[in-house]
Amino acid sequence: MLGSSGRRLLTTVLQAQRWPFQPSRDMRLVQFQAPHLAGPHLGLESGNGGGVIDLNAFEPTLPKTMVEFLEQGEATLSVVRRALATQLPVLPRSEVTFLAPVTRPDKVVCVGMNYADHCREQNVPVPKEPIIFSKFASAIVGPYDNIILPPESQEVDWEVELAVVIGKRGKYIKATDAMAHVAGFTVAHDVSARDWQMGRNGKQWLLGKTFDTFCPLGPALVTKDSVADPHNLKICCRVNGELMQSSNTNQMVFKTEELITWVSQFVTLYPGDIILTGTPPGVGVFRKPPVFLKKGDEVQCEIEELGVIINKVV
């Protein structure tokens, strides 16, 4: 059961949503915990901002982690379709804790400078090839978890991103086949320590991107058939209620299919792998003067049809 602070956050979540979302029959997969459960369970979010249907209670043979669920492919998805067609008990949102929809993926792939308007913000040319870097999976936290400011950095910044979740293993994937390898989409916050990303560690991006808690995800993995067009979604970020980033995924330079084709030339993609597809303009480092996160700040990252994640900085 949530305490008063948790109830306040729930109210904030519901108030934060600015755009219309898909109806509750859409497939919005979550990982969650509840006081009466022995450990994490898989669930269905009953509409964006709604309660949770416990899929493991509906079908006890289902895996309890998203990666294992995705590895089983169509067999597990058919169970979820049956659950959607059945009147099932819904756990109130106030009684569950949302985890990241995917935890412990094989890899988290990230894409830099992948929004045309973000390139204009930096006064740099649009890349001719995707710029790829990574985060460690240990950076992943849930949609309402805290972001911990590391004492090693004084320049921690925000980046809202559309995240693609892989559902089918593949290597050398053709663009025409790429969407067949996608399970769905979720909201990501690519928290970034700019001093480490841009000035230290030989200007290699990894350390500045992968401090603990630097990859909030959620609230749900929305399956691809529940998203009208992933490349035409409003995307925004607010810090303490102030709009900092506002764009549309139609500004992406390299779309999902191109990114999957490119990345799969170098590495095998596995179910549960996550691809963060880049951020729009409005990040703190390019403001005049620059603005960075501080303790007590609250960051809301929101994408149309997918939902909103809210993380307090501590």
Swiss-Prot record:
Which terms under GO biological process does the entry name? oxaloacetate metabolic process
Give the required cofactors.
Mg(2+); Mn(2+)
Q: Using the record, list the residue span of the signal peptide; answer none if the entry has no such feature.
A: none
Q: InterPro entries from the xrefs?
A: FAH, Fumarylacetoacetase-like_C, Fumarylacetoacetase_C_sf
Q: Which Pfam families match?
A: FAA_hydrolase (PF01557)
**Cofactor notes:** Requires a divalent metal cation for activity.
Q: Quick one: which residues bind Mg(2+)?
A: 159, 161, 190
Where does this polypeptide localize? Answer: Mitochondrion
User: Which GO CC annotations does the UniProt entry carry?
Assistant: mitochondrion
Q: Does the keyword Transit peptide apply?
A: yes
**Modified residues annotated as N6-acetyllysine in this record:** 203, 234
Q: Which residues carry this modification: N6-succinyllysine?
A: 203
A GO molecular-function descriptor: metal ion binding
Catalytic activity entry: oxaloacetate = enol-oxaloacetate
Q: Which UniProt keywords apply?
A: Acetylation, Isomerase, Magnesium, Metal-binding, Mitochondrion, Transit peptide
Family the entry assigns? Belongs to the FAH family.
Q: What does this protein do?
A: Tautomerase that converts enol-oxaloacetate, a strong inhibitor of succinate dehydrogenase, to the physiological keto form of oxaloacetate. It is thereby required to maximize aerobic respiration efficiency by preventing succinate dehydrogenase inhibition.
This protein's name: Oxaloacetate tautomerase FAHD2B, mitochondrial
**Organism of derivation:** Bos taurus (Bovine)
